[in-house]
């Protein structure tokens, strides 16, 4: 593990421990809600994992956006590393959202995915763009053309973030009654 600092290994271990503890507490000790009062199944606890995944994926897309702009503005190696890091994190957290969301949807509304719902489909497209970015980085020869293409697709992916946020906001309508 040449080139990996001791502090990096310790921070990674600490982060993974924190994530595991959060998962454990989210499913066992999270505040309980009377399901009969809230008309919600016991599966609501998945939201303690699902919602942070979503916010972290949006933050990862901000890293991807900043990296893409830095790459186009200065051909910065730091910008390219931000693109790589942002796309990896966005895929990790995006898959967490796409996996945990249907669990909640099945329990709450009886369907795991509603193909007519703009926010679900936009977020699915966003995760698909991220998957493409990660796979393209691994399968294409590293060069300026490849980096330009990946940065452009990263900018497109970031453009979907405000759409997802706009349609995810519960203020326009109560999401539980929209089904």
Regions found by a protein language model. Name each.
Residues 1-14:
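N-terminal membrane topogenic signal
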Residues 18-34:
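Alpha-helical transmembrane segments of multi-pass membrane proteins
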Residues 73-84, 140-147:
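Membrane-interface helix-boundary motifs at transmembrane edges
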Residues 153-166:
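Hydrophobic alpha-helical membrane-insertion segments
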Residues 89-137:
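Membrane-interface helix-loop-helix modules in multi-pass inner-membrane proteins
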Residues 41-56, 114-115, 119-121:
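Short aromatic-rich membrane-water interface segments that cap or initiate transmembrane helices
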Residues 53-67, 124-137:
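Hydrophobic cores of alpha-helical transmembrane segments in multi-pass inner/ER membrane proteins
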Residues 167-174:
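Conserved small/polar residues in nucleotide/adenosyl-binding loops
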